């Protein structure tokens, strides 16, 4: 366990309402489908989610505005979106691990502009416990 992981668990608990976990979450399988090929659902554990609310800084807004003049991909906003989605995804996986799940099925993202320049990104799905299907 790395130094400061207690602080991370406390932050997760404060932000999400569920306790942080020391469990490894890298093994959690995620799919947008409602089943995983080669696995069977042993138990459905419930809806899991990760929510991140992010605002753009004044510098990011100015930089993005300049990029729009030139046209093309607005890399500053693309990077911000990717980082925010990754954080929401990680929180969803942590929630699934805390419930004892090793997979998330029906995974989705949603984004809502809460107010000017402030966006909520939600990653959600159903936490399940799966096991490999054994050939008969």
What is the predicted function of each stretch?
Residues 48, 53, 61-108:
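Short, well-ordered alpha-helical segments
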Residues 66-67, 112, 120:
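Short, flexible coil/turn micro-motifs enriched in small/turn-prone residues
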Residues 2-58, 119-136:
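N-terminal presequence-like segments and the immediate start of the first folded domain
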